[in-house]
Every structure is written in C-alpha cells, then in structure tokens.
C-alpha cells in the first residue's frame, strides 16, 4: 500500500516540478498528509426505492433507457482473430469509432464484457450540447481563445455528425433539435451570465442571447442564456443502431468478452479472460475510464457520481429543451416525450454530484434533488425512475482522446467525458478515426491525453491529494463491528485482523466475503447502498455486491478472502 501511495505522489511531483512547484514526494511528507486528513463517510440505511425497477446489468437502479433497445447480432467471442482495429468498449465512444472506421473499409472487432451500451451510455441523460459543462469562461482561461474555439467547433460537429448518422441510417432514436437554457446559480451576480455569453460568442457559437425568461420553467431568477441548435436523443436506441450499422459494414461485435490485457507494439495484442486473443494494427480502449493504464491517465481525471430522477408531467406542460444552472454541483433537466407510465411526458432531472466512493447518502441526495425539482416544476407527478451514473472529470475540463500516454503509437484511449459523454464520445469517433487513418485533425492537440495544462495545476494537486487521503482507510476501523449487524441485501467493510473485508448479506441472508482492496491501486472500497455496489474512492472502480468488476480502471474482481 505504501508503495502505491508513492506512485501516486511520484506523478504529483513530476507535474508540480514541470509547473515550478516545490512538492517533494518524501515518505514523511506523504504520511503527514494522510494523518492530517480524516475521511468521514455517512451511512445510509435507505432501503430499495418504492418504485425502483430492478436491473441486473450495471448496478442496482434502472434508467429510462434500459431494456428498450432492439438486440444487435452480438455474440460471445469463441476464437482468436486478426483485424485492422480492435475496440474495447461498446458504448457510444467505442461504437462511434467502430462505425467511422468500418464505413471507411477497416476491418473492426468490438469487445465488451457486458451488453451493447450497457455501461455509462445507458446511465446518461443524453444531452447533446456544445455548451461546455465548465463554461467557456473557464475553458478560455485554461486553453486560450483558440482552444475554446476548437472545443466549441468539436462539440458542434459532434451533434451535426449524430444528426447525419440518424438521417442517413434512418435510426428511430428520438433525435430532436432543441434550445438550451443556462440559468445562474443562486446569488450569482448578473455579470456572470453576460461574461459566459461573450465567451461563448468568442468561441464561435452562434445566436447565443440573454433573455429574461424562457417560455417554459425558470430554474433561477436573474434571466438566462438561450443556446440554439442543441439536441437530445435516446442513447441506447442510438448505439443499438450503430451496432447494427457496423455489422452491415462487416464489423464484428462480441459481448461477454472481458479483456484482461492490452499490449501495444508493431501489432497490438488484446487478450480476454476466456483465453482468446485479438491481433490488430491498432487498439482503442473506450471503457469510460481506461483499463489498460495503471496511473498516468488516472491522475488527470477524477470520478464523480451523479444522481437522476425521472417523473411524469402532464403532456406539453414543460417545453422540450435542455435546462442547466451554474450551481456547484449544477442541475440539468430535459423532457422525454410520452415516456411516463400514464402516457405523460417524463421530466428527467439530474445533479447532486459527489466524488465516487466518498459518500453513502444517496437517499438524502435524491430527496434534495426531488425538493429542488418540485419547487421549480410543481406539476411533477410520481417519480418513476431513480438512477445514478459515473462521470470522469478531467482536471482541465476537456476529454482525453488520442494516443495513450507512455504507450506505443497504436494504442488509443477515449476518457474524461466531463459530463458530456455523448458529444465527447462522438468526438472520439471522429478524432481517433483520423489518427488511425493518419489524417490531420485540428482537435488533436486539444484532446491529447499527454497534454499538460499548467493553468489547471491547482485542481490537479487537489484531486490527487484527495486520492492519497483515501489510503488512510487501511488503518481505520471497519464500518461496523460485526457482520451480524449487516441487514439483508446490504454490505459493509469490516476489519478482520490486518485485512479489510467487503461483506455482503444477500436477500436470503447468506453472507458473501471478498477482499475490500481494489485491485487497481489498493484503495479500500466503500459500499453504495443505492446501487448495491462496492465503489473505489480513489479512481472510481466499481464492483457488484459479489465483487465482480463493473467499471474500471480495475480490470479484475475483488479477490477472495484468504483463510
């Protein structure tokens, strides 16, 4: 464990040295930091949601998108293969890349250990926007005016590309162009909105205007900005359509194929847990967060959990649009037409973000989110969906798309979605295709995973100190004193001698024990009582109640307990 902390601090030191900092990764210094920061985790005894629909895919809650797609002809991998490009991950980033490459004649193999779109793609709220989450004032400060223009251009192009694919391939995925409305945070001076409007215009967005109030809801007083030509769609229907189009172009998609090893070289080699291997000219790892990178990329982004409610509203009572505010954490809202149980529209509201694995108070967060929503949407009916998703937040606000740092030139990654996974995923499809085809791309430097943004060093240091602090859990007591205190369908971390044990009691009362040590970089996992998962507070790895890995960067299950 001590060696792992040093690896994290070693990368912190390298970054600080480049920026002129003075941090020294000495043993005493790192231990002082660990002693000086205490971690408090709340407890949450909130049981299963009254209206929650069971999901056996990626976690314990179910989004509106789950279970609504037509199956593509995916199948388990039963043999080794050669191909031009192997893509690991069948979400929007992986399938967008596979679609573009297969349309250009490349032979493509896609591998995923779950169903198509079964990761974070089915847990998004599917806003398609060129309004950067961190705001253009921040993006311009961190990346300059040219960088802000490239960010605006790439997200605009991503929406246009999605629309073109929908029309060309005739996808039935509820794609619709809508306006977006950005509201100020409570108490923010009105100048903030005007600064953001001017920065957006400098970045090249067209038609951004300040209005006193939209035709629909008012999230906060003080006016708002209207951004035209945003969009929304049904994400699982879209990626299912992509999968079918890929297969029509000769691409092959294999599910239930857990990739255990990714090796670059003159030819890349991708090995699966089942013992098969794919040999490819290039490999793209598009798994939300890379499973082939131990440290470097994970010091440049941080995992956050975000919460979503879906509630019926009378038809046409809320105009179809995207709505956001500038609160911290911010709220985001959209409408899905005719999607409520009674045929009404479904209001989708998200927010209440926190660092993954560092809070277990999901019930309270849902309650706060509901209170916020009902105050602004008094027509809200019964809540029909509650779900959460994981967002990878890069320290400088933009995704990490391109060649994997410290790797061979034929290994590519797409990560750091920053709450804009749908457009960043499509950007990955366009950018990585150009890189593999050896074409110039104006966005390449902006999204380069090896970039160093010195202006974001404060966030970089803060996030990595937060990671280091989590190793204090090694010397802390367990969540409770005895596994007898664990109710059915719940879990807790217990101390057993020098070991930390993740204990889950299933609905029948049977106890299941796994090591609580995350196999990625040895942090201690925490129980998530809403999703019924074990979550790593360092880099966001997630495991089901029985210890099976769901999300990277960990690439293996929680270990059995040694007796």
Can you describe what each PLM-predicted range is?
Residues 42-85, 558-561:
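Extreme N-terminal leader/targeting segments of oxidoreductases
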Residues 85-110:
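N-terminal Rossmann-like FAD-binding beta1-loop-alpha1 element of flavoenzymes
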Residues 103-123:
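Glycine-rich FAD pyrophosphate-binding loop
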Residues 139-245:
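Rossmann-like flavin
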Residues 225-274, 281:
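Helical element adjacent to the flavin cofactor pocket in flavoenzyme catalytic cores
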Residues 261-336, 470-474, 478, 484:
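Flavin-dependent oxidoreductases
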Residues 309, 492-563:
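Rieske [2Fe-2S] iron-sulfur-binding domain
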Residues 328, 355-460, 514:
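C-terminal catalytic lobe of FAD-dependent flavoproteins
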């Amino acid at each position: 464990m001590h060696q792992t902390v040093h690896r994290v601090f070693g990368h912190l030191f390298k970054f600080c040295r480049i920026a002129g900092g003075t941090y020294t990764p000495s043993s005493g210094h790192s231990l002082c930091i660990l002693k000086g920061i205490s971690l408090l985790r709340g407890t949450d005894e909130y049981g299963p949601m009254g209206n929650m629909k069971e999901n056996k895919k990626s976690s314990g809650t179910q989004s509106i998108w789950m279970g609504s797609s037509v199956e593509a002809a995916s199948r388990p991998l039963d043999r080794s293969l050669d191909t031009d490009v192997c893509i690991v991950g069948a979400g929007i980033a992986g399938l967008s890349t596979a679609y573009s490459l297969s349309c250009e004649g490349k032979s493509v193999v896609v591998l995923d250990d779950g169903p198509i779109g079964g990761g974070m793609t089915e847990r998004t709220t599917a806003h398609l926007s060129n309004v950067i989450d961190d705001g253009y004032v921040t993006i311009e400060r961190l990346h300059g005016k040219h960088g802000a223009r490239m960010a605006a251009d790439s997200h605009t192009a991503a929406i246009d590309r999605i629309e073109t694919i929908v029309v060309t391939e005739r996808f039935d995925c509820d794609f619709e162009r809508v306006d977006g409305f950005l509201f100020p945070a409570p108490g923010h001076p009105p100048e903030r909105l005007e600064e953001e409007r001017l920065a957006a215009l400098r970045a090249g967005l067209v038609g951004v205007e300040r209005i006193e109030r939209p035709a629909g809801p008012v999230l906060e007083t003080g006016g708002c900005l209207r951004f035209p030509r945003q969009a929304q769609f049904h994400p699982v229907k879209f990626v299912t359509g992509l999968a079918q189009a890929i297969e029509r172009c000769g691409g092959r998609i294999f599910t239930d194929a857990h990739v255990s090893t990714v090796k670059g070289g003159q030819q890349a080699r991708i090995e699966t847990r089942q013992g098969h291997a794919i040999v490819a000219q290039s490999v793209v790892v598009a798994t939300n967060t890379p499973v082939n990178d131990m440290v470097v990329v994970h010091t440049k982004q941080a995992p956050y959990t975000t919460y979503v409610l879906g509630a019926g509203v009378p038809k046409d009572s809320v105009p179809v649009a995207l709505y956001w505010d500038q609160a911290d954490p911010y709220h985001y809202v959209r409408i899905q037409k005719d999607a409520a149980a009674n045929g009404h529209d479904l209001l989708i509201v998200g927010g209440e973000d926190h660092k993954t694995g560092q809070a277990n108070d999901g019930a309270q967060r849902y309650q706060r989110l509901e209170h916020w929503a009902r105050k602004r949407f008094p027509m809200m009916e019964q809540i029909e969906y509650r779900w959460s998703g994981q967002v990878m937040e890069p320290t400088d606000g933009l995704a990490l798309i391109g060649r994997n740092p410290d790797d061979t030139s034929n290994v590519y990654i797409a990560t750091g979605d920053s709450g804009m996974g749908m457009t960043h995923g499509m950007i990955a499809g366009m950018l990585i295709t150009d890189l593999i085809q050896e074409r110039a791309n104006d966005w390449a430097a902006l999204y380069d995973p090896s970039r160093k943004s010195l202006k974001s060093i404060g966030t970089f240091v803060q996030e990595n100190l937060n990671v280091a602090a989590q190793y204090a859990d090694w010397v802390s007591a367990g969540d409770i004193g005895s596994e007898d205190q664990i109710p059915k369908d719940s879990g807790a971390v217990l101390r057993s001698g020098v070991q930390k044990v993740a204990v889950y009691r299933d609905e029948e009362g049977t106890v299941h024990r796994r090591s609580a040590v995350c196999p990625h970089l040895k942090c201690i996992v925490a129980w998530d009582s809403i999703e019924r998962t074990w979550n790593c507070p360092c880099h966001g790895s997630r495991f089901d109640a029985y210890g099976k890995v769901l999300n990277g960067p960990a690439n293996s299950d929680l270990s059995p307990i040694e007796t």
